[in-house]
Amino acid sequence: MSQLQVRHDWKREEIEALFALPMNDLLFKAHSIHREVYDPNEVQISRLLSIKTGACPEDCKYCPQSARYDTGLEKERLLAMETVLTEARSAKAAGASRFCMGAAWRNPKDKDMPYLKQMVQEVKALGMETCMTLGMLSAEQANELADAGLDYYNHNLDTSPEYYGDVITTRTYQNRLDTLSHVRASGMKVCSGGIVGMGEKATDRAGLLQQLANLPQHPDSVPINMLVKVAGTPFEKLDDLDPLEFVRTIAVARILMPKSRVRLSAGRENMTDELQAMCFFAGANSIFYGCKLLTTPNPEESDDMGLFRRLGLRPEQGAAATIDDEQAVLAKAAAHQDKASAPFYDAAAL
């Protein structure tokens, strides 16, 4: 009998009851649903690039790109087009069919939109799907990006509405929901998830998933991030989350949003192979691959492929994953810091 339910009216107590299930029961339920919709042995592969690093005016307490915290990160302007295209060609050669671009902004400026649209068009001309995360979007900006051919847009909710004020004060929860609404209305696909391990309670993890699952349409992709603690940020000394609670979050996300991609996102570099294996069984079916986070590297491509072989997993053919995570888009920023001579797009203000 099928356990799959596509609903948009989940109550908090229902979700908390799922979190409270014995682990074996929860994993059985999540994996059964996962198997109904997806090939459980295929994992979508994502490649991404930070196209503008640092100097963000927001105060997200987890983020080393905030200008408010001394994390040793050097700010950079928008990358030159040829630099972006070189990275995209490399990603395609490595097997990616979707290229993901992220900028550390509160929101893109209107004067940067022509350049961003050109970037979308030129990456698409390589035969790749495109995705971006640029901060908040107006309805007009979402329509412009959609008209340029952007396939996916990421904007995370981060946590529950109740805990949100302890994480961020410079934009509201409604700001985030409005951006998701603009993206969906434009015809682009929505990527939205959150970060766990930020000192939140279990009910906050349930609240985050409730918000995502009760959107008018489920996100096409749901990145679940484990906090990457970066020196200099307010969250650098938080206690580690019990890894099994992370697995529970993946499993409940799969149950609530059975047809969405559930992305095992930032924080994998600190996860054991055994923990990742449990996440794949619980319903995660996408990863970031070959990327480098600001402070620590993502698992090496060879390590990921070795893990795939040990688990009998294979990369999904013909579809690489999207950029759906503002924390994971911190990817590659550290690598760029060592390229002081790299060309930038001069017209864009920091």
From Swiss-Prot:
Keyword Cell membrane: no
Family annotation (SUPFAM superfamilies): Radical SAM enzymes
Pathway: Cofactor biosynthesis; biotin biosynthesis; biotin from 7,8-diaminononanoate: step 2/2
Cofactor: [4Fe-4S] cluster; [2Fe-2S] cluster
Principal EC category: transferase
NCBIfam families the UniProt entry points to: bioB
Sequence similarity: Belongs to the radical SAM superfamily. Biotin synthase family.
Full protein name: Biotin synthase
Organism, as annotated: Shewanella sp. (strain ANA-3)
Organism placement in taxonomy: Bacteria, Pseudomonadati, Pseudomonadota, Gammaproteobacteria, Alteromonadales
This protein's encoding gene: bioB
